[in-house]
Design a protein with these regions (language model features):
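N-terminal beta1-alpha1-beta2 submodule of the flavodoxin-like/Rossmannoid cofactor-binding fold
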Residues: 1-80, 84
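FMN-binding flavodoxin-like domain, especially the glycine-rich phosphate-binding loop
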Residues: 57-160
């Protein structure tokens, strides 16, 4: 690895495959548009499944978080996170929360107030911003938008 390479770390969990698809396409897009970078994907579900211990991040990172909630409407009820809680445990581990640039939420707009609610809850809980959101698997425009945000955060230079 070159000494001046920047490592972009994308921490995520994907249950239905939508977030996995988005993060993979985002990685490919970033690598095609910016030089001097490597992109590290960290799938929390794999760490849990393989029984690996959580660890402290060496580099700043961005979290990608789908919304899975227990029933309800996200206002009076139905705002209890299910299935994605290991991501919160990973962020809370050691000093990881301080290294997180922010969260990108995903969900389904049909769920109105519940749309990206988990990302908003993490933002409040850990004190980092919701950087962006996308619906379902995300479109190319979403990938370009999120890539631009990441480029700003990591101060990346575009390839000519």
């Amino acid at each position: 690895m070159e000494e001046n390479m920047k490592t972009i770390s994308l921490v995520y969990i994907s249950l239905s495959g939508n977030t996995e698809s988005f993060v993979t396409r985002l990685k490919d897009y970033l690598l095609s548009q910016y030089e001097g970078i490597e992109v590290q994907k960290i799938h929390i579900k794999d760490l849990v499944k393989e029984g690996q211990d959580f660890y402290e991040m060496d580099n700043p990172y961005v979290v990608f978080l789908p919304t899975y909630l227990e029933g309800g409407n996200g206002v009076d009820n139905g705002d209890v996170e299910i299935l994605t809680t290991p991501v919160g445990d990973f962020i809370a581990y050691g000093d990881n929360a301080s290294k997180c640039f922010g969260v990108v939420g995903s969900g389904n707009r049909n769920f109105n107030n519940q749309y990206c609610l988990t990302a908003k809850q993490y933002s409040q809980r850990f004190g980092f911003p919701v950087l962006a959101d996308f619906e379902m698997r995300g479109m190319l425009e979403d990938i370009k938008r999120v890539a631009a945000i990441i480029a700003d955060l990591y101060e990346l230079e575009r390839e000519n």
